[in-house]
């Protein structure tokens, strides 16, 4: 628990202090956000707001992770783990793709950055590398960061994927989550606030896995997860970095995270879900992100097949704006729904453990 508290404190401090520095720097450089011409009229006033604030989030996560482990090495000699570095590597690689996308948008002064092919290739490369490496680095207990067995709240022994299929599965998971968070980042503070809640839920889940790990506490209901405490540290660091960033990103936002932040945060969810063996449970925890990306898919399919739109605008947070909800109303209500989803997800996780141990 000490490491988790340290991780949150460092991440909040770095993010909340670095973000205003980036605001001033990006404002001087003219790194302003471009607004969709077909977007809600109320968003046009946001044109020129500094973007790429995700740099502060990623920096906060890295500083927190290594700062926490620096303290850990001094106290108990434990350093970074393969699982932790894989998740951070995935998030950073996706953040780099997002950074290039943001930079091109700014340089060209339009809301279109990397072309679809380049962006897809970047995400694909990061996902494939993650999938391949997730089945390496076997520890003394025979555990790798990822598992070829599909998982809900723990591995489902009856559903085992071949290595190549597992890598393909990782590509789907990474692509889905990175796009889901990216689509959600359309209102001031919405994605950052929701992400903080999802990561807080993951802190509880991974810390419980650590306390009931088969390697240290064998018995009924134990978890075969490699490096669960390190995953809890990453989840705590991400939650802290999002909270620090939210101080400046809350409505009216002084800076946006951009694709730099949204793609990186999507990578965090994808990485945590795979390494903690909770790929299916993550859909419940991140229900808001799932709903947002689903609204886009539904809108596209409906328009291509019928020529009609289901929503006035997708992602569907814009639909609610266009029907008369104030932006802050949409944000707060979506945060409430996220809190409910996270509570439900944690309850499902814990109830499965109670059922397993026969409590």
Swiss-Prot record:
What's the protein name? Phospho-N-acetylmuramoyl-pentapeptide-transferase
Q: Which reaction does it catalyse?
A: UDP-N-acetyl-alpha-D-muramoyl-L-alanyl-gamma-D-glutamyl-meso-2,6-diaminopimeloyl-D-alanyl-D-alanine + di-trans,octa-cis-undecaprenyl phosphate = di-trans,octa-cis-undecaprenyl diphospho-N-acetyl-alpha-D-muramoyl-L-alanyl-D-glutamyl-meso-2,6-diaminopimeloyl-D-alanyl-D-alanine + UMP
Instruction: State the annotated membrane topology for this chain.
Output: Multi-pass membrane protein
The entry's localization annotation reads: Cell membrane
Supply one GO BP term.
cell wall organization
What NCBIfam families would the database entry show?
A: mraY
- TM helices/strands, residue ranges: 3-23, 55-75, 84-104, 117-137, 156-176, 190-210, 231-251, 255-275, 283-303, 330-350
Superkingdom: Bacteria
Q: Which organism is it from?
A: Mycolicibacterium vanbaalenii (strain DSM 7251 / JCM 13017 / BCRC 16820 / KCTC 9966 / NRRL B-24157 / PYR-1)
The Swiss-Prot or TrEMBL record lists the needed cofactor(s) as: Mg(2+)
Q: In which pathway does it act?
A: Cell wall biogenesis; peptidoglycan biosynthesis
GO MF assignments: metal ion binding; phospho-N-acetylmuramoyl-pentapeptide-transferase activity; UDP-N-acetylmuramoyl-L-alanyl-D-glutamyl-meso-2,6-diaminopimelyl-D-alanyl-D-alanine:undecaprenyl-phosphate transferase activity
Top-level class of the enzyme under EC nomenclature: transferase
Q: What does this protein do?
A: Catalyzes the initial step of the lipid cycle reactions in the biosynthesis of the cell wall peptidoglycan: transfers peptidoglycan precursor phospho-MurNAc-pentapeptide from UDP-MurNAc-pentapeptide onto the lipid carrier undecaprenyl phosphate, yielding undecaprenyl-pyrophosphoryl-MurNAc-pentapeptide, known as lipid I.
Stated EC number for the protein is 2.7.8.13
Q: What keywords appear on the UniProt entry?
A: Cell cycle, Cell division, Cell membrane, Cell shape, Cell wall biogenesis/degradation, Magnesium, Membrane, Metal-binding, Peptidoglycan synthesis, Transferase, Transmembrane, Transmembrane helix
Give an example GO cellular component term for this record.
Answer: plasma membrane
Q: Which gene encodes it?
A: mraY
Similarity section: Belongs to the glycosyltransferase 4 family. MraY subfamily.
């Amino acid at each position: 628990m000490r490491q988790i508290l340290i991780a949150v404190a460092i991440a909040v401090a770095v993010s909340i202090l670095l973000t205003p520095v980036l605001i001033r720097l990006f404002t001087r450089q003219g790194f302003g956000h471009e607004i969709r011409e077909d977007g809600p009229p109320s968003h046009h006033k946001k044109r020129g707001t500094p973007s790429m604030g995700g740099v502060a989030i990623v920096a906060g996560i890295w500083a927190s992770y290594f700062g926490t482990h620096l303290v850990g090495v001094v106290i108990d000699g434990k350093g970074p783990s393969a699982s932790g570095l894989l998740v951070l590597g995935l998030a950073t690689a996706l953040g780099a793709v997002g950074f290039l996308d943001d930079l091109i948008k700014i340089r060209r002064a339009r809301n279109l950055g990397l072309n679809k092919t380049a962006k897809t290739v970047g995400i694909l490369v990061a996902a494939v590398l993650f999938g391949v490496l997730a089945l390496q680095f076997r520890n003394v207990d025979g555990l790798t960061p990822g598992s070829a067995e599909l998982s809900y709240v723990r591995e489902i022994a009856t559903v085992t994927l071949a290595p190549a299929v597992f890598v393909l599965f990782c590509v789907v998971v990474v692509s889905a989550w990175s796009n889901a968070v990216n689509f959600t980042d359309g209102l001031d503070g919405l994605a950052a606030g929701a992400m903080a809640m999802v990561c807080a839920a993951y802190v509880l889940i991974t810390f419980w896995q650590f306390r009931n790990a088969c390697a240290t506490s064998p018995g009924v209901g134990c978890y075969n997860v490699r490096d669960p405490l390190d995953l809890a540290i990453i989840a705590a660091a991400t939650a802290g970095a999002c909270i620090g960033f939210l101080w400046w990103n809350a409505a009216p936002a002084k800076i946006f995270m951009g694709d730099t932040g949204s793609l990186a945060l999507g990578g965090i969810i994808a990485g945590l879900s795979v390494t903690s063996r909770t790929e299916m449970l993550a859909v419940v925890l991140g229900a808001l992100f799932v709903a947002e990306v689903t609204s886009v898919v539904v809108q596209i399919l409906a328009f291509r097949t019928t020529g009609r739109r289901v929503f006035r605008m997708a992602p569907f947070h814009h639909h609610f704006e266009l029907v008369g909800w104030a932006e802050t109303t949409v944000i707060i209500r979506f945060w409430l729904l996220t809190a409910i989803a996270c509570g439900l997800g944690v309850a499902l996780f814990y109830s499965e453990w109670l059922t397993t141990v026969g409590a």
